[in-house]
Amino acid sequence: MKIADMEIADMKIADMKIADKEITDKGIADKRGAYKEIKLIAVDMDGTLVDDEKRIPEENLRALEACAAKGIEIVPATGRTVQGVPKELKALPGVRYGITVNGAVVADLKENRVISSCRLPAGLAVQVMTMARDCGDDVMYDAYVDGVGYTSECFYGRFPQFIQSEALVRLLMSARQAVPDHIAWIRENASYVDKINMFFRDQDARERMRERLGQMPELLVSSSLSCNLEINAAGADKGGALIRLADFLGIARESTMAFGDGENDLSMIRQAGLGVAMANGVPAVKEAAEYVTLSNEEAGVAAAIRRFVLK
């Protein structure tokens, strides 16, 4: 190996060590003039605010509590429904509004009221789930309707076959009701569907379905897990919901901050005045962010809040 190559390799190793141990700065100093004092913080749940056991680290709660004391709006921004927002987060004084089901529903959490929505017509949702049923691959699929998850009885006990994390399996099962045939239930009882979830055991099957769904312009397809796809109505994304909520509250985009780790957080990271990715985030999110903080297992949300908000 040439000396120059060795030096480059050493530099790469050093960079990896810094990324592992430190908060990684991606030039935020160059953008200080482009955003104002933070007045709204939107934070993803899974892989971001909560740890791998689906608990909110105390350090994160205390940091958000300190932000709320300064009058900053704390906004859960999640693929979960309103019911899936952790109770201890809802209890914080600065938490009133939520961006849920990937931006399909923006809600007033205190008054249990929908502020804006962008949902799938039930007929389109039935078409998509029928496509999954008939695709020939081992796919598990369900849907959220008015904040409640519905799945077929044949799927309910199969989550451990698709998801390795016991904590995530418990969370997913607690958010769903089993009915004999949820496609039939939606056809007969629903006008709109908040979001469709699909789970795959095979990556090739997942990519085949993503390609098919990508040919339907009325859909927005994203993902928060390596084994899933999340299907929303076109126009339902966290970034658009963040801007709509900020406008509703009279807050400039430049005064917003957003945290995320997954593909379904990408629009929000791009739209926020200050986008912060987690160290455990997917490459596209870390590339889009102005700043990369510590992982969800290291209370990375609190670390970035201390650096930029609680200075």
Label each PLM-derived region with a short phrase:
Residues 1-29:
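Long, intrinsically disordered low-complexity tandem-repeat segments
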Residues 37-52:
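Asp-based phosphoryl-transfer active-site loop
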Residues 92-94, 101-102, 110, 216-217, ...:
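Short, structured coil segments at secondary-structure junctions
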Residues 71-75, 94-96, 195, 254-255, ...:
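Short active-site oxyanion
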Residues 131, 138-259:
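Conserved acidic, metal-coordinating active-site core of Asp-based
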Residues 35-40, 56-57, 214, 230-311:
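Mg2+-dependent phosphoryl-transfer enzymes with acidic/Ser/Thr/Gly-rich catalytic loops
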Residues 54-70, 117-124, 179-183, 235-247, ...:
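Short, acidic loop-to-helix structural element flanking the phosphoryl-transfer center
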Residues 58-164:
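Active-site phosphate-binding/coordination module
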